[in-house]
Amino acid sequence: MKEMINLDSSSEPSIVTKQFSVEECLSKLKEQHCYVPMRTIGRLRLRKSSDQTEKKCWKEKLMKIRSELEELWEQSMMYEEQKELTQLGEMLDRLWDKHINSEGSKSETISDTAISGNDDTMEKRLEQFSDDTLQDTLETEKNLNSKTSESLKSPTLSYPFDLDSLDKRIFKLESKIGYADEPLSELLNKCMEKLEIVEQDPQFWQSRIESWKQLLAKDFLKHHERNLCSIEKQTTLKNSSLKELCTEEDIVIMLEICSSQLPFVEQYMPILPLLLERLKSLQNMHTDAAEAISSWQGSKDVMMTMQSELNEWKNTVERLDHSKFYTQSVEEMRRLSDTVTQLEKRVLKLQ
């Protein structure tokens, strides 16, 4: 069964007449009466409507304040700050409830005047439906209020809340700890996920932590021993080099001389940079001269070796000149020639 309402206007014939069923009228009224509490809205976007711009601006402001308070409550690490923020949230909830109740009463009066021209059955059904919807919304609101009050339960404070002091404290903490690139809510979520992983098997992670501690202790001991060995080697090398160069008495005498000359150093302060530059240039010159001397010394050594070889050759030649080898060889040649001639004569005689 559908009861139809004919809304035609005889005074304005240009307007198109429409027919609405009872269910459609009830659904429209339900949309007006069944408001959503502010706690359940969170950060959802509001529906756009050109009729209620002022009301929605007011709602949007309250919702922005509420969302900022929720973010601050999530980011705050102090219990006192959370208590103060929950008090502010309760105050905003009261303002929200008052505003919604006033809107509900206005909508009820408007709906009653709009439907007053209809029959009695329509009014009764609308009144029953509005009462039922109001009771349902009140029950849902009470349940949500109880849930939020339990989740954000905190004792009342004896002093008023000041946002400036909270901002100053947050600024001090950030100046001491440092500014994080990520928001605190994401960091807290990551920490919670890690804690959940650890809580799943605490014995396993405890054994791992103990093994890591042992490994770290061993690495620390090895590193410490290496540092000690290197320091001991450096100290021994320094002491040995100093002992080789000079004795302790010489070191004491040099220190006394340096300390006695310290007052005169101030007089030569403007000249010292020029002297240092001159010494650096002289150092380069000395290195070049040392290289030239070393190369000349090498060439001199080569010449000395060549001279010694020439002397040896001269000595051998002189020995050959003064030796009797030449005279002995000439005599032997004569003897050989004589023997050859004698042999030739004998051969001729035989012929």
Swiss-Prot record:
Keywords: Chromosome partition, Cytoplasm, Meiosis. Its main location: cytoplasm. One of its GO terms (biological process) is chromosome segregation. Transmembrane segments: none annotated. The keyword Lyase does not apply. GO terms for cellular component: cytoplasm; cytosol; dynactin complex. It is found in: Cytoplasm. Required for correct meiotic chromosome segregation. This is Meiotically up-regulated gene 1 protein. It comes from Schizosaccharomyces pombe (strain 972 / ATCC 24843). The lineage of its organism: Eukaryota, Fungi, Dikarya, Ascomycota, Taphrinomycotina.
